[in-house]
């Protein structure tokens, strides 16, 4: 019911908002401007269309929130991890502190743009977008945040106790076709990375950079400390008992063009659009020798960033990653 109501509100808000935007802009064409800007009808039309645009945007956003709420009630929940044995699944690991951001909806289309572009923003949460991108490789599963009332849309959720989770997560990592781990300096995430390093072939690990450079650098430092501690006190890889060498995590790449010429700023309608960045800044994939490669989705490489060129950029940068994952043997 919530999903149906949400879609109804989305459509109604889009129609109302776009109609208001069109009428508002039309009021400023040369043949519509009244002499001296004194005609009451012109002012009423301008006010009414502006109100319609604002109300339409509000209804549209409310509709999207209703859809997300409905998806939470119909989300995929895993009752037992035993059912995953022998199946092909992708394990999505992340700091629980990022759940609110990952469950949010994009407020604009890729690259930003005019106000009415909000009506064309995706109705998928950031986690749903991630799951949709990789779901062809297997079912995407995640550990649910302890204490949450409803699972978030996206990966199928299973729940673990707060004080007894590491052995289960280790088994899930070892059995996963691919592990997608969102970088973050928290102790749980850092332990999960070192555990993936211990039990997983390097080509099965994908490190997601939803964070900025500072958080990524803190993650690298925390990983080095945790690796030093665990490699001294705990057994290494199954079968050999030895820990693989700690991989050198690549630097977070700086923008390709941090400064833009004035003509590009003018052509893009100001600096705000040129400051736009992806929520998923990039990802790190590893070769057989644990050599990491940071693939940055960098909008500054484009002179005219827009929804089409940005989509092509991501698809182009992801192609070698998808090829590597396609070649993986079944776990």
Ranges and model annotations:
Residues 153-176, 186-198:
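TIR-domain catalytic/interaction hotspot
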Residues 57-157:
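N-terminal topogenic membrane-targeting module
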Residues 185-222:
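Amphipathic helical hotspot of TIR/SEFIR-family domains
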Residues 7-15, 21-52:
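Hydrophobic alpha-helical transmembrane segments
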Residues 91, 178-182, 206:
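Structural motif
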Residues 220-331:
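C-terminal interaction surface of TIR/SEFIR-family domains
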Residues 96-105, 179-189, 212-215:
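Short acidic, S/G/P-rich loop/turn micro-motifs used as interaction or catalytic elements
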